[in-house]
Amino acid sequence: PTRGNDCGMFHYLTEAGIPFSRLHDVGGYFGGGRFVDIPNLFPDPDADPADPASYRFGFTDLLVTELMKSGTEPFFRLGVTIENEWAVYAARIWPPRDSLAWAKICEGVIRHYTEGWADGFHYPIRYWEIWNEPDNVPDPMENPMWRGSAEQFFELYATASTYLKEKFPHLKIGGYGSCGFYGVTGGNVPTYAATSPRFDYFRTFFDDFLAYVKAHNCPLDFFSWHSY
């Protein structure tokens, strides 16, 4: 939406036949403070995930409803938006204190939009993505998306994906919105796709993630990455 809650341009989605819209960086410059992100939907991390009163769905309800009216299915990212001011203060990009509690919050979000829970909806939203770009920077203290180690993210993914897939076996649970594979060589990758320590980390993170998922038998219905 523009100017906070204006969805007047969404008709272009219909006219262009856009099938999906990924819900990330929503509602203003790099995300705003109202839409989609788990801290926006569930502002008090100590509240009860089973209590509808713990959630603030209003802004995201508007967004999702207008997308569905436009014939565009949300590709729902569960997590937070980028914090480009991390050097001043990193607010929401730390690993959740309790991975299972976080997964239960995500369960409430999914039930609200697909099962009508908490005065919600029965929308056919199929894809639920855990986090975004936890591999953004090798040093966690300089990472604008994930202020934790790779292992901490793998544990969060394992806990959340396993829990959510048990609750919603018919939905697609995956992740993690990788930065991409700029450092890959060979095949059809152009020679100017030079590597760097950061790009190498993208690949290392990916390899270690897949190894962890396999070792722990975690659900991975899809893997998402970016092609900047």
Task: List PLM regions with ranges.
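Substrate-binding cleft and catalytic face of glycoside hydrolase catalytic domains
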Residues: 16-228
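Mature N-terminal, pre-catalytic/accessory segment of carbohydrate-active enzymes
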Residues: 1-19, 24
